[in-house]
Amino acid sequence: MKFLSLFFLALAGVAFAHDGGMGGMDMIKSYSILGAMIGLGIAAFGGAIGMGNAAAATITGTARNPGVGGKLLTTMFVAMAMIEAQVIYTLVFAIIAIYSNPFLS
């Protein structure tokens, strides 16, 4: 965890390195991109954990009672779609924050 924190802090320094001629609009663009990347990374990480837990629970339920495997599989696919939808919503929000930022106009 300490390595990841140090890595992101070092990455932010490289991302915002400039020669002093950067205006306010460029700084807003940089922060928008950094915020979008961090938000999308957190959403993808949380979605992956949720999908793993859903798959593990479905496999455990099917192993305990093979007769309801079909119903559990259907429920798992619905849960996977809902989890993935949250990640896609975050991606759409990140794209909107980057390309049509209201603070840049």
Swiss-Prot record:
Q: Does the keyword Flavoprotein apply?
A: no
**Which molecular function GO terms apply here?**
lipid binding; proton-transporting ATP synthase activity, rotational mechanism
Topology with respect to the bilayer: Multi-pass membrane protein
Give the record's GO CC terms.
Answer: plasma membrane; proton-transporting ATP synthase complex; proton-transporting two-sector ATPase complex, proton-transporting domain
Q: Which InterPro entries match?
A: ATP_synth_F0_csu, ATP_synth_F0_csu_DDCD_BS, ATP_synth_F0_csu_sf, ATPase_proteolipid_c-like_dom, F/V-ATP_Csub_sf
- Chief location of this protein within or outside the cell: membrane
Question: Gene3D superfamilies annotated for this entry?
Answer: F1F0 ATP synthase subunit C
Q: What transmembrane ranges does the database entry give?
A: 3-23, 32-52, 78-98
| Protein's UniProt keywords contain Cell membrane | yes
Its keywords, alphabetically, are: ATP synthesis, Cell inner membrane, Cell membrane, CF(0), Hydrogen ion transport, Ion transport, Lipid-binding, Membrane, Transmembrane, Transmembrane helix, Transport
Pfam families cross-referenced by the UniProt entry: ATP-synt_C (PF00137)
Q: Do you know which SUPFAM superfamilies this protein is assigned to?
A: F1F0 ATP synthase subunit C (SSF81333)
Where is the protein found, in the record's own terms? Cell inner membrane
Q: Where is this site: Reversibly protonated during proton transport?
A: E84
Which CDD domains does the entry mention? Answer: ATP-synt_Fo_c
Q: Can you state the subunit structure given in the record?
A: F-type ATPases have 2 components, F(1) - the catalytic core - and F(0) - the membrane proton channel. F(1) has five subunits: alpha(3), beta(3), gamma(1), delta(1), epsilon(1). F(0) has three main subunits: a(1), b(2) and c(10-14). The alpha and beta chains form an alternating ring which encloses part of the gamma chain. F(1) is attached to F(0) by a central stalk formed by the gamma and epsilon chains, while a peripheral stalk is formed by the delta and b chains.
Which family is this protein grouped under? Belongs to the ATPase C chain family.
- Job of this protein: F(1)F(0) ATP synthase produces ATP from ADP in the presence of a proton or sodium gradient. F-type ATPases consist of two structural domains, F(1) containing the extramembraneous catalytic core and F(0) containing the membrane proton channel, linked together by a central stalk and a peripheral stalk. During catalysis, ATP synthesis in the catalytic domain of F(1) is coupled via a rotary mechanism of the central stalk subunits to proton translocation.
**What protein is this chain from?**
ATP synthase subunit c
